[in-house]
C-alpha cells in the first residue's frame, strides 16, 4: 500500500485503494473501475493475461514454526499438525507436493493468518505454511516475533508484479520508471525494511 502511494505521489496521480472481490478482478480492470492490480499479484501462470511491470518482489511458500519447536526442516514435519490458509498459494503448493504432505500428521485449513498464529502460539498446531512475505510481515508486527522462525527450505517460489489491463503500456511504463527511480534512491528498500524487517524487493538487482 505504501509503495503504491509513493508511486502515485511521484506521478502526481490520486491514489485510491479499491478493495475488490478477487474473482472479479478481470472485470474490474477491463471496465476501468481500477487501473491496476497491485496486491501480492503472482505473475506465474498469468504472464500473457495482463500488461505487467517487471517483478518487484520474489515470494516463496515457507513454513513458520516456534523457535523452540525443534523443527528445522521438512523431514521434521513428519507426524506434525500443519495449518494453511484456505485458497492460498501455500495451499496450492502443498497440494502439488503430496510426497511431503503425506508425511504430516494432519493438514488443516484456517480462514486467516491471525488465527493461524494464535493456533501456533497455543500449541494447537506445529507449523504454518504461508508466503514468506506475509510471514515476515506477521512476525515483524508481533511483540513476541522472536518466538517464531521461518524454515530455510521452501515449498515453491513465485514473482509478484503489478498487472495492468492488456495493452496499457503507457501507465505501466510510467509506474515502472518510477519504481526504478525509487530502487535507485533507496526508497524501495526503506519501505520494505519498515514492513518486512528486510529488503525483499528485486527491482534494480
Identify what each model region corresponds to.
Residues 24, 40-49, 93-98, 121-122, ...:
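A ligand-binding cleft/hinge motif common to bilobed small-molecule-binding domains
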Residues 1-10, 80-81, 88-89, 161-198:
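Extended ligand-binding regions for polar small-molecule ligands
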Residues 54, 65-82:
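Flexible hinge/capping segments at coil-to-helix
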Residues 4-13, 90-111, 139-144:
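Ligand-binding cleft/hinge of the Venus flytrap
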Residues 1-40, 185:
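Extracytoplasmic small-molecule ligand-binding "clamshell" domains
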Amino acid at each position: 500500500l505504501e509503495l503504491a502511494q509513493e508511486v502515485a505521489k511521484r506521478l502526481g496521480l490520486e491514489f485510491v485503494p479499491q478493495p475488490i472481490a478477487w474473482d472479479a478482478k478481470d472485470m474490474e480492470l477491463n471496465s476501468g473501475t481500477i487501473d491496476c492490480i497491485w496486491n501480492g499479484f503472482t505473475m506465474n501462470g498469468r504472464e500473457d493475461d495482463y500488461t505487467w511491470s517487471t517483478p518487484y518482489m520474489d515470494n516463496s511458500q515457507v513454513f513458520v514454526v516456534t523457535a523452540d519447536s525443534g523443527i528445522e526442516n521438512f523431514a521434521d514435519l513428519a507426524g506434525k499438525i500443519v495449518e494453511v490458509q484456505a485458497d492460498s498459494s501455500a495451499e496450492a503448493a502443498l497440494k502439488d507436493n503430496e510426497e511431503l504432505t503425506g508425511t504430516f500428521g494432519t493438514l488443516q485449513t484456517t480462514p486467516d493468518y491471525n488465527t493461524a498464529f494464535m493456533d501456533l502460539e497455543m500449541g494447537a498446531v506445529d507449523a504454518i505454511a504461508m508466503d514468506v512475505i506475509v510471514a515476515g510481515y506477521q512476525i515483524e508486527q508481533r511483540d513476541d516475533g522472536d518466538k517464531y522462525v521461518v524454515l530455510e527450505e521452501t515449498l515453491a517460489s513465485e514473482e509478484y508484479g503489478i498487472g495492468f489491463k492488456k495493452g496499457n503500456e503507457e501507465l505501466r511504463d510510467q509506474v515502472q520508471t518510477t519504481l526504478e527511480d525509487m530502487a535507485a534512491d533507496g526508497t524501495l528498500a526503506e519501505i520494505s525494511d519498515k514492513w518486512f524487517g528486510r529488503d525483499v524487493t528485486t527491482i534494480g538487482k
